[in-house]
Curated annotation (Swiss-Prot):
A GO CC term assigned to this protein in UniProt: cytoplasm
Keyword Magnesium: no
EC number: 6.1.1.21
Protein name: Histidine--tRNA ligase
Listed CDD domains: HisRS-like_core, HisRS_anticodon
Organism: Actinobacillus pleuropneumoniae serotype 7 (strain AP76)
Length: 423
């Protein structure tokens, strides 16, 4: 017997029993975004490696350690580790943002070579939003308000909380970086080798360290908010005022910097403790210099991404009231040579006139007992039974499989009206 080929570590299949919840969440995301007037875009999964190096930053963990990169002839390519860089590349290349505001969204798989754990995989899925050409804090507020609405739609709003910060301009951040490095140089004895490397290459990333001893020291470190330029300070104050007025609760977290180099001014994360240790469900911020950095005209940008695996786990954990639609509403069983054609014609008629229903026709043979077992297995609500006599009399037997009520015989001409009443 040939050896089974297994899925790659950290890359998972989605089974028929799991996919309805995924579809339910994805549809909620689509509907909320449509309600705010956002347009879907679709970008390639593979991009040129320099795109991510320039956008995300050479010294970030994502670029230096986590990307799936390969050579195609003389071109270095990478499976996308996130969606913003590719969306900005497409917006520049296709002219979507030339003298134009854009509110865009996308959904799909991303790839990072990191240690697989609950809710974090090597192939994972994100829904992302990118807004271009709007410098005002009102759009930052809209993105946060939009996500808050989505959490209510998903029934998880009581289990997520918003953390907010401003990391200012590049110049303000450079001044803060110098002050932070000067402070941390007195505490290198507490640092791991990796943290010492970060101190040299990307010191702001030390702010979100998991090192407990270093966390305590950081409580006395210089605060980024104290180094903000006037424009960033005013932008952040107006954002906070809008969120207060809209009743959006938040915590200003001075250690929040996000893991990608392109951010400036506003950064935010929605976090949860419902999955064990605190985890990020959604994160984003402003990236006003990224379009120009990647070769476009100076264009402000702001966006966020949410991890769908984390959302699936969170919804499963805290929302037990979901009524997921069944894949099969009506199961058509039949027996007899003449009944086969009649069954297929009837099923097609239902699909045409009641397209919201899932209709499955039995195709694997067997007696009625076997066919009903299959109908039960797929959890159909209604079974329609057609035999030779039903074909002759142009009737159909309707059996409610969920209630166990007595089966009824109805004219085939009345079937659509009867199903409309029941669904």
């Amino acid at each position: 017997m040939a050896k089974n080929i297994q899925a790659i570590r950290g890359m998972n299949d989605c089974s028929p029993t799991e996919s309805p919840l995924w579809q339910w969440i994805e549809n909620k995301v689509r509907n909320v975004l449509a309600g705010y007037g956002y347009s879907e875009v679709r970008m390639p999964i593979v991009e040129s490696t320099p795109l991510f190096a320039r956008a995300i930053g050479e010294v970030t963990d994502v670029v230096s350690k986590e990307m799936y990169t390969f050579w195609d002839n003389d071109e270095q390519l990478t499976l996308r580790p996130e969606g913003t860089a590719g969306c900005v590349r497409a917006a520049i290349e296709r002219g979507w943002i030339y003298n134009n505001e854009q509110r865009l969204w996308y959904m799909g798989p991303m790839f990072r070579h990191e240690r697989p754990q609950k809710g974090r995989y090597r192939q994972f899925h994100q829904a992302g939003v990118e807004v271009f050409g709007i410098p005002n804090p009102e759009i930052d507020a809209e993105l946060i308000i939009l996500t808050a609405r989505l959490w209510k739609e998903l029934g998880i709003d009581q289990h997520v909380s918003l953390q907010l910060n401003s990391i200012g301009s590049l110049e303000a951040r450079a001044n803060y970086r110098s002050a932070l490095v000067k402070f941390l140089e007195n505490h290198t004895a507490l640092m791991s080798d990796e943290e010492k490397e970060r101190l040299v290459k990307n010191p702001l990333r030390i702010l979100d360290t998991k090192n407990q001893a270093l966390q305590e020291v950081l409580n006395d470190a210089p605060k980024l908010l104290d180094y903000l330029d006037d424009d960033s300070r005013e932008h952040f104050a107006h954002l906070c005022h809008l969120l207060d007025a809209m009743g959006i609760a938040y915590e200003v977290n001075p250690k929040l910097v996000r893991g990608l180099d392109y951010y400036n001014k506003t950064v935010f994360e929605w976090v949860t403790s419902a999955l064990g240790s605190q985890g990020t469900v959604c994160g984003g911020g402003r990236y006003d210099g990224l379009v120009e950095q990647l070769g476009g005209h100076a264009t402000q940008g702001v966006g966020f991404a949410m991890g769908l695996e984390r959302l699936v786990l969170l919804v499963q954990e805290v929302n037990k009231e979901i009524n997921l639609p069944k894949a099969v509403d009506v199961y058509v069983v039949y027996s007899g040579e003449g009944a086969t054609l009649n069954a297929f014609q009837m099923a097609e008629r239902i699909r045409s006139e009641l397209p919201q229903l899932g209709v499955m026709t039995h195709c694997s043979g067997g007696n009625f007992k076997k066919q009903f077992k299959r109908a039960d297995k797929v959890e159909a609500q209604i079974a329609l039974v057609i035999g030779e006599s039903e074909v002759e009399q142009q009737t159909v037997v309707l059996k409610d499989l969920q209630s166990g009520a007595e089966q009824v015989i109805i004219a085939q001409a009345d079937l659509i009206a009867e199903l409309t009443k029941r669904f």
